[in-house]
A protein has these predicted regions:
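Flexible, glycine/small-residue-enriched loop-and-beta-strand segment within the central core
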Residues: 2-14, 18-83, 112
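Proline-centered helix-kink/hinge sites
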Residues: 38, 104-105, 113, 133
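Glycine-centered loop/turn positions within well-structured domains
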Residues: 50, 101, 105-107, 115
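C-terminal segments of enzyme domains that contribute to small-molecule binding surfaces
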Residues: 55-81, 113-157
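Catalytic-loop signature of eukaryotic-like protein kinases
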Residues: 72, 90, 107
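Beta-rich strand-turn-strand
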Residues: 78-91, 97-101
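Conserved G/P- and acidic residue-centered "switch" motifs that form tight phosphate/ATP-binding loops
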Residues: 93, 111
Length: 157
């Protein structure tokens, strides 16, 4: 974790994932090999404007929804991810996005609110990568396959 980053005790972070400076993370699970940039806010408290009061005095009465972030996810600079969102493996969140809804595996989203831009790979390639589950390999196997992992997806056809 970098300086000025706050990671609350109710956060689980997978192996090899990192969080850059000035980020705030609570109430979430982050998979392995995730890259989280600076100024990222994950699962900040949301005020329920449907209640009589929006004041956090009633927060102890509310159940917060956990954020789930898959493996090998890239979260760019100054992103906000609201509570309850699920982000699939290999997804990319563009800089400055506010993520209010789930993001599918290998989907690229951006904007306020975050919207679909495109998928990183074809559906066939995504299925192969999901089946491969390389992030579950041990460190020896990963080191032996660095050349493979640094190639484009043409190799999996």
């Amino acid at each position: 974790m970098s300086e000025k980053t706050v990671v609350k005790s109710n956060v689980e972070i997978g192996d090899y994932s990192y969080v850059n400076r000035s980020s705030y993370i609570e109430n979430c699970t982050i998979g392995k090999f995730c890259s989280i940039s600076s100024g990222v806010y994950i699962s900040p408290f949301e005020h329920d404007y449907g209640l009589i009061t929006t004041h956090p005095i009633v927060s102890s009465q509310l159940t917060r929804k956990r954020v789930e972030i898959g493996n090998d996810v890239l979260i760019s600079l100054n992103v906000v991810i609201l509570e309850g969102v699920k982000i699939g493996n290999g997804a990319v969140i563009g800089a400055g996005a506010v993520v209010t809804k789930d993001v599918k595996p290998y989907e690229i989203v951006g904007g306020v609110p975050a919207k679909h831009i495109k998928y990183r790979f074809s559906s066939e390639e995504i299925n192969c990568l999901e089946d491969l589950r390389w992030w579950e390999w041990n460190s020896t196997k990963i080191k032996k396959n660095l050349k493979f992992l640094s190639r484009d997806t043409d190799i999996i056809h």
